[in-house]
């Protein structure tokens, strides 16, 4: 028999975890001082007055390296728990992890061939 009250803890956690950030934003909005002036609106660069144009364009290569780094960082996050419990999980999980690593290798070879890893 399916009983709805089995999920009371989940709903309480959901309500509390949603209310805390909302209350934090509301309280900071009410208690924060409102001081708008020329000093508040000026940009700050390591304690000195900014010189020149503040608009800089970054090369797309930085984004490509960052994207490849994030992909392999997420791979590490997924593979670390698997490696810690390798002896308990069995062969089927080993095959799944192997497929996961093969997909990542195919993705890295694709990025390499597209020139995303070359700095030119």
UniProtKB/Swiss-Prot annotation:
Protein's recorded name: NAD(P)H-quinone oxidoreductase subunit 3, chloroplastic
Subcellular location: Plastid, Chloroplast thylakoid membrane
Summary of the function given for this chain in its UniProt record: NDH shuttles electrons from NAD(P)H:plastoquinone, via FMN and iron-sulfur (Fe-S) centers, to quinones in the photosynthetic chain and possibly in a chloroplast respiratory chain. The immediate electron acceptor for the enzyme in this species is believed to be plastoquinone. Couples the redox reaction to proton translocation, and thus conserves the redox energy in a proton gradient.
Domain of life per record: Eukaryota
Record field: catalytic activity: a plastoquinone + NADH + (n+1) H(+)(in) = a plastoquinol + NAD(+) + n H(+)(out); a plastoquinone + NADPH + (n+1) H(+)(in) = a plastoquinol + NADP(+) + n H(+)(out)
Gene3D superfamilies attached to this UniProt entry: NADH:ubiquinone/plastoquinone oxidoreductase, chain 3
The protein's assembly and partners: NDH is composed of at least 16 different subunits, 5 of which are encoded in the nucleus.
Record membrane topology: Multi-pass membrane protein
Organism encoding this protein: Carica papaya (Papaya)
TM region positions: 9-29, 64-84, 88-108
Family matches, as Pfam families: Oxidored_q4
GO process terms (BP): photosynthesis, light reaction
Family, as annotated: Belongs to the complex I subunit 3 family.
Taxonomic path: Eukaryota, Viridiplantae, Streptophyta, Embryophyta, Tracheophyta
EC class: translocase
This protein's encoding gene: ndhC
Keyword Oxidoreductase: no
InterPro entries for the chain: NAD(P)H_OxRDtase_bac/plastid, NADH_UbQ/plastoQ_OxRdtase_su3, NDAH_ubi_oxred_su3_sf
GO MF, one example: quinone binding
Coiled coil stretches, renumbered: none
Alphabetical keyword list: Chloroplast, Membrane, NAD, NADP, Plastid, Plastoquinone, Quinone, Thylakoid, Translocase, Transmembrane, Transmembrane helix, Transport
Enzyme Commission number(s) of this protein: 7.1.1.-
A Gene Ontology cellular-component term: chloroplast thylakoid membrane
């Amino acid at each position: 028999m399916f009983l709805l009250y089995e999920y009371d803890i989940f709903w309480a956690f959901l309500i509390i975890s949603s209310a805390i950030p909302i209350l934090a934003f509301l309280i900071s909005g009410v208690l924060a001082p409102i001081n708008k002036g020329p000093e508040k609106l000026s940009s700050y660069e390591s304690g000195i007055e900014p010189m020149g144009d503040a608009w800089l364009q970054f090369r797309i290569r930085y984004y490509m390296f960052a994207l490849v780094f994030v992909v392999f960082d997420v791979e590490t996050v997924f593979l670390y728990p698997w490696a810690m419990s390798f002896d308990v999980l069995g062969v089927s999980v080993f095959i799944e992890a192997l497929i996961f690593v093969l997909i990542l290798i195919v993705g890295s070879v694709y990025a390499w061939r597209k020139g995303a890893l070359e700095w030119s």
